[in-house]
A protein has these predicted regions:
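N-terminal acidic, proline/glycine-rich, low-complexity intrinsically disordered segments
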Residues: 1-9
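N-terminal helical cap/lid subdomain that shapes the substrate entry/recognition surface
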Residues: 10, 17, 22, 27-120, ...
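A general structural motif
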Residues: 28-31, 127, 185-187
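Short glycine/proline-enriched coil/turn segments at helix->beta-strand junctions
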Residues: 93-95, 126-130, 184
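Substrate-recognition "cap/lid" segment bordering the active-site pocket of phosphatases
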Residues: 131, 137-189
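Acidic di-acidic motifs
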Residues: 191-193
Length: 193
């Protein structure tokens, strides 16, 4: 079946929906590995789920360092900018146990996410391997993917622990990911919001 550059083929990921004008679906014909970020990518940012994580980060810093909200937000922002993630800054500057932090910040209400059978069906239509690459923990990803009903669509979850707590976009993290799963970057695509 042929398709125009502005609409995907009917059996494509999104089905017969119009997308950005000029999108050439044939550019993805070589892809055999589909990699998805989790937060605000596999679920809609409009769910405000990650806002819960952000608030929990701030609360963790407030409690750990006896700071008010504004000071905690400043520290959170500064560590993110300087180290690529708040967690990395807390580890490097304060010797923080990352597991305590991850357990705390990911203690959120995932019931705000609806099941996503259409997304599951779309992922099923992608030929090849499907992997999740997240800056969160595997437990966090599992809870979200299970809630959405799409956990079984993915071969593996590569989390911040597997990345040795080095956040994206550090090049060595992508190299580690590709090495661990035998991914050829030339035939892979990463979706990240």
């Amino acid at each position: 079946m042929t398709h125009t550059p502005s609409t995907p083929p009917e059996d494509s990921l999104l089905g017969p929906v119009a997308l950005k004008p000029g999108l050439d679906w044939s550019a993805l014909d070589h892809v055999d590995t589909w990699i998805f970020d989790l937060d605000n990518t596999l679920y809609a940012a409009g769910s405000r789920l990650f806002d819960q994580v952000h608030r929990r980060m701030t609360a963790f810093i407030m409690e750990s360092f006896s700071l008010d909200r504004e000071a905690a937000l400043t520290l959170q922002r500064d560590y993110f900018r300087a180290h690529g993630s708040t967690l990395r800054g807390l580890m490097l500057r304060h010797g923080l146990d990352p597991h305590d932090y991850l357990n705390y910040v990911h203690d959120i209400d995932v019931s705000v996410l609806p099941p996503a059978p259409e997304l599951g069906a779309a992922i099923d239509r992608l030929p090849g391997r499907k992997l999740v690459f997240t800056a969160g923990s595997t437990a966090h990803a599992d809870r979200i993917l299970t809630r959405m009903g799409i956990a079984d669509r993915f071969e593996a979850i590569f989390d911040i622990v597997a990345a040795d707590f080095v956040p994206k976009p550090a090049p060595e993290v992508y190299d580690l990911f590709c090495s661990r799963y035998g991914v050829d970057a030339a035939t892979a695509v990463l979706f990240e919001a």
